[in-house]
């Protein structure tokens, strides 16, 4: 690679292998090792720091992605995390590792849900869009801002409402929705909301189809709504109700 610097500005070209990045203030995983990394970056510091990522392509055992974007630091009397315009494409991703690579700007609710809900599976055809003043994330009511992550999840096991995310501690309170398995679904984060739309899946031995699970606002008091079609033994239907919050 190469780096050029002059008068408070510069550019960098990277084409490397087996690279470790320190990203403690960027993503949840503080050290990310990449088998392949290519990037074209420009920056300037006047009147405030601006970083333009013209292109980045990275891959390791967990993930393969491409992205581009602009970051502007807050300036003058303003303070805060700054402004970001980021567009990304996820080529492949090991689902349980997803939380490690999502920007911290996505917020603790989103990151915690990803860490505990995606038990297994793989992500394909993913896209990510973040645009706006990061101090106002996830941009509820912000017409000129955007946060949206969409992806296809296949062969997945999903804990749609993990107790640890809800702050539930007692054994009784930890009774949550049964694990959904063998899922092929579309996953969407849109601002503060999360929606899972599954064409197929299973709970116990019951087969599920046309399932939609939605959390309107991620956070410690999130409410989950689920509807869909289930086919299977009556005993499994009763068990599902009795071991989920439906029985409360």
Residue ranges of model-derived segments:
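Membrane-proximal interfacial segments on either side of biological membranes
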Residues: 1-52, 63-203, 207-248
């Amino acid at each position: 690679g190469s780096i050029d610097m002059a008068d408070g500005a510069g550019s960098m070209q990277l084409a490397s292998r087996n690279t470790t990045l320190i990203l403690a203030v960027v993503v949840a995983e503080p050290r990310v090792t990449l088998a392949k990394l290519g990037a074209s970056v420009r920056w300037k510091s006047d009147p405030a720091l601006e970083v333009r990522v013209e292109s980045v392509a990275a891959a390791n055992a967990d993930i393969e992605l491409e992205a581009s974007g602009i970051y502007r630091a807050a300036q003058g009397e303003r303070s805060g995390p700054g402004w970001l315009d980021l567009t990304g494409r996820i080529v492949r991703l090991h689902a349980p590792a997803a939380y490690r690579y999502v920007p911290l700007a996505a917020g603790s609710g989103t990151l915690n849900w990803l860490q505990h809900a995606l038990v297994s599976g793989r992500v394909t055809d993913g896209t990510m869009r973040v645009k706006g003043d990061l101090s106002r994330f996830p941009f509820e009511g912000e017409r000129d801002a955007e946060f949206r992550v969409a992806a296809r999840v296949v062969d997945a096991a999903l804990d749609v409402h993990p107790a640890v995310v809800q702050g539930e501690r007692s054994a009784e309170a930890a009774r949550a929705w049964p694990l959904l398995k063998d899922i092929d679904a579309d996953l969407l984060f849109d601002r503060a909301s999360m929606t899972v739309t599954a064409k197929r899946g299973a709970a116990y031995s019951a087969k599920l189809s046309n399932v939609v699970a939605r959390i309107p606002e991620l956070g410690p008091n999130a409410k989950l709504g689920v509807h869909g079609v289930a086919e299977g033994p009556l005993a499994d239907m009763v068990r599902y109700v009795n071991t989920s919050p439906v029985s409360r």
